[in-house]
């Protein structure tokens, strides 16, 4: 096997998806701890210790204890090289999260075992379904009182329409949490409390019928023996092919805060999760084994370094090898660029990348020329598909405290919209600026960043907009007529794409009936 193929096959690129507060940032910390990237994990909420979680690094995130932007972390584990994309967990941050899911080959779904399947998880699973992404499941917070584990798995199967195959099974919960039984290894791994900041050297007892188990956990030993007969009869066996098709999820139980069960998941991801997968373009499928370089930009992050007002474009490599100083072709602009200073990430710590392979995420310095969805190749005119914008669900009019700063405001909004923090719309027949987001917190983030990064003080006003749709029509005459008759509802977005701004859903439905030749799209390919 060639050295290149060995490098590609080592890669596992995944994201963590969950509802807010299910423990996603904590699990990210613990995953990094096992990957030796962190020696002592930071604790997230109420950070009196001053140990901010490593993956939450913008000022606002540090203040709130939530992960607002998508961080990228690479670390070795076992024989693999793992790329973990941390996604915003707070319920208001989904568009960035959606797009991040286009750059991974598998996902880890974290569920709060006391609550079960929650709303944001359902929404994120819908996005993974667009590409049938394989899912690994972690039932978290076993150190608290939880719902019945069989009930939890039934809920995942019913609500998320995916079969569950338990890999580990809990013994007790809350104050009585004793550990887990690993079905495939036929061993019990015992839990010790108070070890959250370090890697536990867990005691392992081989075999359910081992008398050592009765000594270690008393009456719980007989209980788990009886329970396992029931569990094996009532659940699915793990099937690797069904997992790769996104039809079945292996399920693990543990506590991220107690640092227990995280290594079991990592073992499963390294063993079963797919290596870098082929990617669709408008004209053909790109295979990771191809020697020529290609990749696409799924996120742009402004000012990762507060000392420098720069922007970094996050690129997923799809084929070929990145080497320092190589020439890349920026397909949308038709330009060749020399890239000598691409970055690899350890959440806010940047290292210069000397080489990177399919599945890796690298950062390109961007002075305003790179957009979300851009493709880079070694000359071939390819365009990767499936990195969409999603129609916002909330809108505000944005206004300046100082009217002389209109130019800076527009510049700031366009840059923030290019990195996906927010969407901006300029109505055709007024000078208003409308900001669209998927959640309220994004509005706060934008005003905060306009102030700190662009020295612009802006305020919001309510506006009667219910939703937005991107407008397309192949017939220019019909499109011109539509523009003429509906100009008061039309705007251009940050990329100058025509958008219908609907004051109510009723208005949108009537317009769709009235103009059947016009396509009103909920998503827009970048």
UniProtKB/Swiss-Prot annotation:
Subcellular location(s) per record: Cytoplasm
Binding site for GTP: 18-25, 86-90, 140-143
InterPro entries attached to this UniProt entry: EF-G-like_DII, EFG_III/V, G_TR_CS, P-loop_NTPase, PrfC, RF3_C, RF3_dom_3_sf, RF3_GTP-bd
GO CC, one annotated term: cytosol
GO BP: regulation of translational termination
MF terms (GO), sorted A to Z: GTP binding; GTPase activity; guanosine tetraphosphate binding; translation release factor activity, codon nonspecific; translation release factor activity, codon specific
Cytoplasm listed as a keyword: yes
Keywords: Cytoplasm, GTP-binding, Nucleotide-binding, Protein biosynthesis
Domain annotation tr-type G: ranges: 9-277
Entries under NCBIfam families matching the protein: prfC, PRK00741.1, small_GTP
Family statement: Belongs to the TRAFAC class translation factor GTPase superfamily. Classic translation factor GTPase family. PrfC subfamily.
Role: Increases the formation of ribosomal termination complexes and stimulates activities of RF-1 and RF-2. It binds guanine nucleotides and has strong preference for UGA stop codons. It may interact directly with the ribosome. The stimulation of RF-1 and RF-2 is significantly reduced by GTP and GDP, but not by GMP.
UniProt protein name: Peptide chain release factor 3
Annotated source species: Shewanella pealeana (strain ATCC 700345 / ANG-SQ1)
